[in-house]
C-alpha cells in the first residue's frame, strides 16, 4: 500500500485517503476503560508479543508506548491520522504498533483492546481491507478474540458489534461546499447508514472542504458488503462533485480562477496564518490543481502541508514550544518556504 503523504495521485482523484479499521477485544479481559494502568500495559505487552510472533518478520513493526512520550509527540501521530484522540486520552496504558511505511497502525487500549488500521492513498477500499484482514487473521491465530457466533465480534461500543469494521475515505469536496449542497448530502446519507464527519473525525468540523465518509452499520452485513456499499456511495459523490465543478467553471470561470490565484498568492506571501485559514486556502489551491488551473504544484506537497502546518508537527519542525502567535508566524513561514 502507498503512504498517502508520499503519493502523488491522479490530477482528477479527489479521494485523498482510504482507511479501514477493525475493532477487536481479547476474550476474558475487561475493556480498556475498566483496566488499571498496569493491567493495560500488560495487554500492550501481550499484543506486541503476539504481533511479532504472528508477523514472522514480514513487516518491520515498531511499538510506540504513549506513556513514554510527551503530549506533543503523541499529537503529531494524531495529526498524521495514525492514531485517534481516544488512544491519547488513555495514554497511561495505551500504545500503537506501526509498520515502516506508516500504512498499518495497530492501536492498543483505545476504546477496544485492538483497533487495527490500514490507511492508504486514493480510493482503495479493497486493498486496504485485504491488508488489514491478513494481519487480523494472523493475530487471531495466537489470540482468543471476544466473539459470539450469532452477532460477531464483541466491542466496547454497541455500534461496532458484528464485523467491528469502519471503512472510511477522506474526500475533497470544494464545489459541493461552495454550492451549499453538503447539508442535503449529509441528510441523504444518514438515511442509508453512511455518516459524514470533518477532517479529524467524530465531532470535528469540515475545514478546508475535507470530509470523512464512513459506514455506520457493522451488524448484519459482511465486510465485503460494507465496502461495496461505501464505494458505490463515494463514487456517486465524486460524480456530483465533478458535475458541480463543471457548473462552477461554466458560470463563474473568472471568479473561480481569481479565488484560486488569490489563495495561492496569500499562501506564498503571508506572514501570519492561522490553522483554519491555512486549510481553507490549501483547499482552494488543491481544487486548482485538480481541475488543471495550477500545474506546478503536486498533490503530494499539498498533503504534506495539511499535516506539517498543524500545531504539534510545527513545534516538532521548529523544535520549540510555540505561543499561538508564534505558531501562526511559523506556519506562514513553513508554507512560504515549501511553495517556492
UniProtKB/Swiss-Prot annotation:
Swiss-Prot/TrEMBL catalytic activity: L-arginyl-[protein] + ATP = N(omega)-phospho-L-arginyl-[protein] + ADP + H(+)
Tree of life domain: Bacteria
GO terms of molecular function: ATP binding; creatine kinase activity; protein kinase activity
InterPro entries: Arg_Kinase, ATP-guanido_PTrfase, ATP-guanido_PTrfase_AS, ATP-guanido_PTrfase_cat, Gln_synth/guanido_kin_cat_dom
SUPFAM superfamilies, alphabetized: Glutamine synthetase/guanido kinase
Keyword ATP-binding in record: yes
Keywords on record: ATP-binding, Kinase, Nucleotide-binding, Transferase
Domain (Phosphagen kinase C-terminal): residue spans on this chain: 14-244
EC number: 2.7.14.1
EC main group: transferase
Recorded GO CC terms: extracellular space
CDD domains cross-referenced by the UniProt entry: bacterial_phosphagen_kinase (cd07930)
Family the entry assigns: Belongs to the ATP:guanido phosphotransferase family.
Function text: Catalyzes the specific phosphorylation of arginine residues in proteins.
Protein name: Protein-arginine kinase
Lineage, opening ranks: Bacteria, Bacillati, Bacillota, Clostridia, Eubacteriales
Gene of this entry: mcsB
Amino acid at each position: 500500500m502507498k503512504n498517502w503523504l508520499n503519493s502523488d495521485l491522479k490530477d482528477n482523484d479527489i479521494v485523498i485517503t482510504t482507511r479501514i479499521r477493525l475493532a477487536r477485544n481479547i476474550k476474558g479481559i475487561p475493556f480498556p476503560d475498566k483496566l488499571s494502568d498496569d493491567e493495560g500495559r500488560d495487554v500492550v505487552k501481550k499484543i506486541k508479543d503476539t504481533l511479532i510472533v504472528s508477523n514472522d518478520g514480514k513487516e518491520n513493526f515498531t511499538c510506540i508506548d504513549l506513556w513514554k512520550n510527551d503530549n506533543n509527540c503523541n499529537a503529531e501521530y494524531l495529526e498524521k491520522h495514525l492514531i485517534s484522540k481516544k488512544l491519547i486520552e488513555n495514554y497511561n496504558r495505551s500504545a500503537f504498533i506501526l509498520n515502516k511505511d506508516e500504512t498499518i497502525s495497530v492501536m492498543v487500549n483505545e476504546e477496544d483492546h485492538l483497533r487495527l488500521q490500514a490507511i492508504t492513498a486514493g480510493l482503495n477500499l479493497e486493498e486496504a481491507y485485504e491488508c488489514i484482514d491478513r494481519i487480523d487473521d494472523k493475530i487471531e491465530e495466537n489470540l482468543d478474540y471476544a466473539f459470539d457466533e450469532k452477532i460477531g465480534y464483541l466491542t466496547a461500543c454497541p455500534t461496532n458489534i458484528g464485523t467491528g469494521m469502519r471503512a472510511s475515505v477522506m474526500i475533497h469536496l470544494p464545489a459541493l461546499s461552495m454550492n451549499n449542497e453538503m447539508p442535503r448530502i449529509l441528510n441523504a446519507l444518514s438515511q442509508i447508514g453512511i455518516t459524514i464527519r470533518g477532517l479529524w473525525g467524530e465531532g470535528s468540523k469540515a475545514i478546508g472542504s475535507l470530509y470523512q465518509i464512513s459506514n455506520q452499520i457493522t451488524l448484519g452485513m459482511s465486510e465485503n458488503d460494507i465496502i461495496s456499499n461505501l464505494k458505490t456511495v463515494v463514487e456517486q459523490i465524486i460524480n456530483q462533485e465533478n458535475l458541480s465543478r463543471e457548473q462552477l467553471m461554466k458560470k463563474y470561470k473568472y471568479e473561480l480562477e481569481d479565488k484560486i490565484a488569490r489563495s495561492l498568492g496569500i499562501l506564498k506571501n503571508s506572514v501570519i496564518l492561522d490553522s483554519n485559514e491555512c486549510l481553507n486556502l490549501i483547499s482552494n489551491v488543491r481544487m486548482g490543481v485538480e481541475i488543471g488551473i495550477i500545474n506546478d504544484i503536486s498533490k503530494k506537497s499539498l498533503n504534506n502541508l495539511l499535516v506539517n502546518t498543524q500545531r504539534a508537527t510545527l513545534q516538532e519542525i521548529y523544535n520549540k514550544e510555540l505561543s499561538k502567535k508564534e505558531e501562526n508566524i511559523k506556519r506562514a513561514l513553513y508554507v512560504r518556504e515549501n511553495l517556492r
